[in-house]
């Protein structure tokens, strides 16, 4: 793919990435025109989509009152952070990528790296804050309702930015090597070994471990609650089939006087009658009978089931109830499996996207400073790894907002409003 790659030469520059640079990569500042055009179109499209997607999420939360809750405040803050990445960081990163050299000066380079590390770290830590909020909500739903306040969300958001500052500021205060500023055509983050470990573990590896633990526990808790619901429903059905008591046997007439219409116990209401907790036969002078059966279920209301019966034999054998219970239990099992599969799919998308976008970059970012002289990073591969990390700011609003029906409805309202204005 020669047209997509810079023309190779003898000079070496650093492969630019979300944290400034990954390390040494072979290439020169003179690049092919086709590479510049195609790269500009691709990166311009990515930046435009990232800005538009995150701006729509912020607008939806600001305009739609039903979306203004603590959980969505975290998603909105994530969208603001990714919007900052898209507006403040990606344009300079794209210019660096297209020209294959840094042309904006050392002061702008320091500012670019600081903003890059700050915003990308805060974006990653927002994902941890969302995972932590969901973990508390599903494992302690009763108490957390009162604890889930805007102040708590503000504290989590402030913590993500504080950690981002603590990771981005040290290189500006001198935690770097002399070689970091030796090449005026390169804009590199500190290659100091201590800072490399500090920044990569603080910005990615520790948050990754935390997210894996939290979402693992969320999955176990969700699966336990789903299966507990199914078992509870099955237990109710079993209790209803076995919990049968004989009906009372009143001998008085309805109005308390002899000769009136009697209520007598029907034989089908005895203990042998399945699902019947009480049964009585109303017998008139003409010999016609009507049995009224009350079916009691734990935690539900009574069901009055009038059944026409013959005068001599009135069985209580509602086999259709048993079949209905079995069908209901089977339907609930299928629904539980579907919910469990959906939970696995959702958590898989969240963690899979995060790992796919960031793990390759942070592996290279951790390894390259320790083997700078012997390791080689091809220019094209370095660019793909770098922009894979940046693309997480485009995918976050899709995962956390656009799959949500409430957000979808808000987006439709925004679009319809625009159409109305055009008319």
Curated annotation (Swiss-Prot):
Entry's transmembrane regions: 39-59, 74-98, 108-132, 153-174, 194-216, 347-370, 379-403
Keyword set includes Glycoprotein: yes
GO cellular component terms attached to this protein's record: dendrite; plasma membrane; synapse
Compartments in which it is found: Cell membrane; Cell projection, Dendrite
Binding site for serotonin: 116, 120
Top-level lineage group: Eukaryota
SMART domains: 7TM_GPCR_Srsx
Disulfide pattern: 109-187
Sequence ranges on the Extracellular membrane side: 1-38, 99-107, 175-193, 371-378
Glycosylation-annotated residues: 10-11, 24
Regions of this protein lying in the Cytoplasmic compartment: 60-73, 133-152, 217-346, 404-423
Topology term for the membrane: Multi-pass membrane protein
Entry similarity comment: Belongs to the G-protein coupled receptor 1 family. 5-hydroxytryptamine receptor subfamily. HTR1A sub-subfamily.
Assembly mode: Heterodimer; heterodimerizes with GPER1. Interacts with YIF1B. Interacts with GPR39 and GALR1.
Function: G-protein coupled receptor for 5-hydroxytryptamine (serotonin). Also functions as a receptor for various drugs and psychoactive substances. Ligand binding causes a conformation change that triggers signaling via guanine nucleotide-binding proteins (G proteins) and modulates the activity of downstream effectors, such as adenylate cyclase.
Name of this protein: 5-hydroxytryptamine receptor 1A
Gene coding for it: HTR1A
